[in-house]
Amino acid sequence: QRVMMIDKAPLVGGHSALASGSIAFVDEKRQAAQGIVDSVDKFVADARVTGGSIDEELVRFIAEKSGEGLDWLQTQGVRFSPNIFRAYGGMHPRCVTAFGNMGARRYIFQLHERSRELGIETRLMTRAVGLHRFEKDKLTLRLADEKTKSEYVIQSRAVVLATGGFGANLALRMRYNPNLDYEIATTANPHGFVQDTATGDGLYLAKELGAVWTNMPNIVLLSYWGGRMLDYIGAEIYVDNEGRRFVDETTTTARIAQAILKLPGHSMYVITDAKSAKGVNVGAKITAGSIRLSNSVAEMARGMNVPASELEHTLEEYNKHASEKSADAFGRTVYAQTIDK
């Protein structure tokens, strides 16, 4: 059977190709080897906390099949890092990422290469603009070639919509969350200089066939700038424009986002040190200037334009709790390290 994959961008992968690449799973064999106790029920319970309203049946299915998913990816040539960690915004150590420094691009490139080996055709810069059923078991898909500005129609017995993100669709996202106005950039286009392809095309295509949109307000908000220096929790702090902490940095992404949106200018600084294991995107952020290196607290305070004494007090207070593994004023109890190097 002939299989064809289309992508409206010049490269495959969409936002997934830009992600750090953490994959959550439940697998007794993998987790027990590192002393981690987990279960499908706990996965579902954690999803209720981190995801808000969820399709519990779907989440349970994902959890039950997640170990098999990792196995399948490995059969396709994907290699994983050996350590299982608690990811940013997560509730339990159940994540791995691709081996090396490519993040989720490793998944995308490896699977794309495998698809080519299997004879699957890929058409880039090709947008799906219409999807209709014309017989009981046949569909018509109208495609727009972005290079030639022409349209054509193909027929198929099945169409898989592996898409649906709409973070770059300002009108649509504001319909469900009015706070996400033009000032809130997407992780794929934080500076507003490039095209972000997550405009919800797949949602509209599915709607043409009678699909119902659900859980649309559950838009994930991630702190782009320095907030993703690390892929795991416990080794960084967030401070406001006065050098003071304002949130438990190990809580859910939704709670962190709510706290950031209450700050003047919706901005914060993220601080870690030389001991932490940086994420795969840090090099690009240093080059872009969104992450800066400091040799001392005083130098860091000057760069942030905050009083050095305030920043020193913040770090001293954090390090005290980190050393004692004690709860702080924000309820934080998870610490991977002190921040002092």
Where are these regions (language model features)?
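Conserved N-terminal/central alpha/beta ligand/cofactor-binding core
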Residues: 2, 8-121, 125-130, 134, ...
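The conserved SAM/SAH-binding core of class I Rossmann-like methyltransferase domains
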Residues: 6-7, 216
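Short loop/turn motifs at secondary-structure junctions and domain boundaries
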Residues: 7, 134, 227-231
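A structured beta-alpha segment of the ubiquitous adenosine-cofactor-binding alpha/beta core
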Residues: 114, 125-128, 142-153
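A glycine-rich dinucleotide-binding beta-alpha-beta segment and adjacent secondary-structure elements
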Residues: 130, 310-341
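Short, hydrophobic/aromatic-rich segments at coil-to-beta transitions
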Residues: 135-142
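Glycine-rich loop(s) and the adjacent beta-strand/alpha-helix scaffold that form part
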Residues: 147-150, 154-223
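An anion/pyrophosphate-binding glycine-rich loop and adjacent beta-alpha core
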Residues: 195, 199, 203-205, 209-310
